Amino acid sequence: MIKKRIAASVIVKSNKVVQSISYKKFLPIGSIEPVVENLDRWGVDEIIIFDIDRSKNNLGPNYDLIKAISSIPISTPLAYAGGINNYKDAINVISSGSERVILDNLLFKNSKNIKKI
């Protein structure tokens, strides 16, 4: 039997966790640290950080945010999405502390990068 896994999605806008309503309206939730700590404490299998400002504004990944999250003493694997435009970004995201990367725009912009990752 396949084990069910629970992945928690955390939407980040301007370095704050937000609740998204159809990606048009955003309600502030607060700082990312207590959110990540609570998700780890509740036993989720993976925490996915969606940094929605990064791709939209062509800013590249938020390495400071990834390092800050990875410095929190949690045991839950972390995945990151946002601003990953090439394979070097993906490698740097993993080097900054994320265990996985989530690709979206890169698939449409330059699918050859996927093989390099």
What are these regions (language model features)?
Residues 108-117:
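Short histidine
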Residues 82, 104-106:
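Short beta->alpha connector loops at strand-helix junctions that form conserved
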Residues 1-76, 84-88, 96, 109:
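Conserved N-terminal beta1-alpha1 strand-loop-helix module at the mouth
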Residues 45, 99, 104:
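Short acidic/polar active-site loop segments enriched in Thr and Asp
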